[in-house]
């Protein structure tokens, strides 16, 4: 958004509009962020940049409650996941303490054809990755 300060909001792309709305929400410094698909309309880089920023805000003591539909993003950036279907909570996942077996069992309640595996990046950090079967 750098350099777009005087640009009319209505002329921005959908992704730029989403970033503006989220920036305004984050700057308000509310103790609780309620976010409905904050990653919608964002490209890959901005999606992960935004999620990392939300993660940093939470680590500073604020709370974020998000509705997201990507199991990959949920596993990477969320501490706790509520798995919902038709407005009913089917199960919860703690991404820090639940084993892969438990996560896969719980994810199968919503997603039939995925498997969560662990992999290590070049910096030797372990990530949980969703693989379609």
Kindly give the residue locations of the regions a language model identified.
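H-loop/switch region of ABC-family ATPase nucleotide-binding domains
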Residues: 68-69
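ABC-family nucleotide-binding domains
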Residues: 43
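ABC ATPase nucleotide-binding domains
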Residues: 100-133
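Conserved ABC ATPase signature
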Residues: 8-12
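H-loop (His-switch) and adjacent beta-strand-loop-beta switch element
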Residues: 81-94
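Helical segment within the ABC ATPase nucleotide-binding domain
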Residues: 48-60
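Catalytic Walker B motif of ABC-type/P-loop ATPase nucleotide-binding domains
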Residues: 33-36
